[in-house]
Amino acid sequence: MLYPLIKQALFQLDPERAHELTFQQLKRITGTPLEWLVRQSVPTKTVNCMGIAFKNPLGLAAGLDKDGDCIDALGAMGFGFIEVGTVTPRAQPGNEKPRLFRLVKAGGLINRMGFNNHGVDNLVENVRKSHFGGVLGINIGKNKDTPVEQGKDDYLTCMEKVYPYAGYIAVNISSPNTPGLRTLQFGEALDDLLLAIKNKQVALQAYHHKYVPVAVKIAPDMTEAELIQVADSLVRHNIDGVIATNTTTGRVLVQGMNHCGQTGGLSGRPLQLRSTEVIRQLSAELQGKLPIIGGGGIDSLIAAREKMAAGASLIQIYSGFIFHGPRLIKDIVSDI
């Protein structure tokens, strides 16, 4: 593939500008015969998870295709599943630029995007037009100007709109870039949110005559006691899966590197150890009661295997995909 040459050119640009240019091109070919330009053949390695058959265990994490603009082109690269979003009820611009930074030596990224997206109605239109043959996850969040105390209303609004079109729904309560959002991961706030989400799921199942599983995406920056509490809440409320993990606010492994002091969530290789440890702890606590979708620092076959050995049933890539391109998909799926 030409990705090493393309990457060399893109990495000369501001990270967000490089992302915009790449997606402009992918948007032009998505859903057209020109998808052959990015298509690659990967073996089928079916995994049954959350009651769904995934054609292979490797997915694209949320955050790359926030509005579902390029689902078909990304799908042509061989992902078993794609998670679009995070999407909010209303369009919002996100945080001020610059808000995305490369830590090239570390194979990492720091972002403080802030759920920039064109709103849930726009996403649904894009999803309706797509023809992706894999599983489509839709990641939902709350608007920045919605008070945290009313945050569950945003999740329920998004759930209602995406439910007919989602393979599964991911509930993002762990981004560090929306003020107060991570407080929804704990105690009564978490129980209140999960109860409302489960009740909504039951109502939507009755209305649409189909069951769409719900997974909750958690942060890596929790103590073991906090993780145990989260796991207990997920099981008690019959949530279908957990996505571990989101980005970290920690900087231990990137001290002294360019951009390490930027505010935001760190992803990529520096997150691999911590996210894998969270998965291991969750797996020990959950004892198979619900599946784990593992992400955070997967940039090689070995990193992918480490996640699965720790207890993940499915895995997702984001930063590794940016640093290594579509070839990483084939390398992982072929030998996982």
From Swiss-Prot:
Q: Name one GO cellular component term.
A: plasma membrane
Pfam families registered for this protein in UniProt: DHO_dh (PF01180)
As for subcellular location, the record says: Cell membrane
Q: Which residues bind substrate?
A: K66, N111, R112, M113, G114, F115, N172, N177, N246, T247
Q: Name one GO biological process term.
A: 'de novo' pyrimidine nucleobase biosynthetic process
The answer on whether this UniProt entry bears the keyword Cell membrane reads: yes
**E.C. designation(s):** 1.3.5.2
Keyword Oxidoreductase on entry: yes
Q: What class of enzyme is it?
A: oxidoreductase
- Pathway given in the UniProt record: Pyrimidine metabolism; UMP biosynthesis via de novo pathway; orotate from (S)-dihydroorotate (quinone route): step 1/1
Q: What is this protein called?
A: Dihydroorotate dehydrogenase (quinone)
Provide the organism lineage as a comma list: Bacteria, Pseudomonadati, Pseudomonadota, Gammaproteobacteria, Enterobacterales
